[in-house]
């Protein structure tokens, strides 16, 4: 194990808590930050603190926002009769990259995963059900194409069928076991166009 002063070791530990960041990458990030000019470090720290203090969840869809409702939910040009259900806020960014979807979103903030101890009550399904009214014609389920995403999609289909709304699933142009975050625009567009009713 490397020997660093306590302050450096603490920064390495904090960077290593980020998803996809191991100890080696955390060390590189730490050393990079320490070599930045002091004013850049201050700006970086201010940006982190400001984002953490001002960003919240949209009360309608659950997306990250600095105003409530978010820009998508408050946009009068969005088709509110179509709701695309996704697992995490980052998936909205992926879907928006294709520039073809004009509906609104619903963020579950997770998926159903019995192995991880997450059931339907642990994700934002009650909020989704509350959004289904006479104005919603279709719910597109765009959960990730893995075991948990499929289980979540089937559960959503089952509960929404009773409400008389059309439920579709994006096509599997996205590799099984993959994440929306890593899909390119063409793959996402094909998956959206090839969605099927579930």
UniProtKB/Swiss-Prot annotation:
Chain intervals annotated as zinc finger (C4-type): 58-73
Domain Toprim: 81-175
Keywords from the UniProt entry: DNA damage, DNA recombination, DNA repair, Metal-binding, Zinc, Zinc-finger
Record flagged with keyword DNA damage: yes
GO MF: DNA binding; zinc ion binding
Transmembrane segments annotated in the record for this chain: none
Domain of life assignment: Bacteria
Matches recorded under InterPro entries: DNA_Rcmb_RecR, Rcmb_RecR, Rcmb_RecR_Znf, TOPRIM_dom, TOPRIM_RecR
Record has Phosphoprotein as a keyword: no
GO annotation terms (biological process): DNA recombination; DNA repair
Protein family per UniProt: Belongs to the RecR family.
Role played: May play a role in DNA repair. It seems to be involved in an RecBC-independent recombinational process of DNA repair. It may act with RecF and RecO.
Name of the protein in its database record: Recombination protein RecR
